[in-house]
Amino acid sequence: MPIALKEWAVTVRALAEGEQLITLRKGGIREPEKHFKLDHDRFFLYPTFDHQRNDLVRESHQPELRRALEEGVWNDGEPSVTAFRVEGGIQQPERVRIRAWAEVAGHFTISDPRCVDALSPFYVWTPDYAEKRLEWKRRHPLHVLLLRTYRIPRPVTVKVKDEYGVCSSWLELQRELPFEGTPVLSDGEFERAAEEIEGITREASQPLGQPVLV
């Protein structure tokens, strides 16, 4: 069965629109080894809502919070705008739409908050929230995944299962999905951005996987 990486719905949407190129990981409290481990080099992007908050998304992408609701299907209708204000304000829907997958083009670890700030053009969270990801589990470095994202030809709706709610990075989807589709950025656009990201992380990290520039 295909593997998916769990990420906020607004982040999944940004990745699928080419507005975000990286994700930052420390790992959930239910990770098998208690911290993040990159076990897969390509995976589908699974949207989550229950920890997503509007005050942790930068001002320029606030409108995307409402549009990100399209990634879920609620039997009782979409949640209200006020639900975005607190963590847990939006429950995970009955079903979610899988519309993109990603391959890892680079994997770095960093511990310098200045590097997190320098990477801010490549994510939609507030810089303060990104730094909080660094500070959590302080003894462990922050994993920076450079992702080449692809939109699948037609979004696929999958049923949300109880085991998907465990606080961990990965899940196994219970239906087959195609690793097909179009990259959200052209080869040239992605290569230029990847070179900039690699340059930012070079002095602050040791690359765990060399970027694959295509």
Language model features with spans:
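Structured alpha/beta reader/binder surfaces that contact nucleic acids or chromatin modification marks
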Residues: 1-214
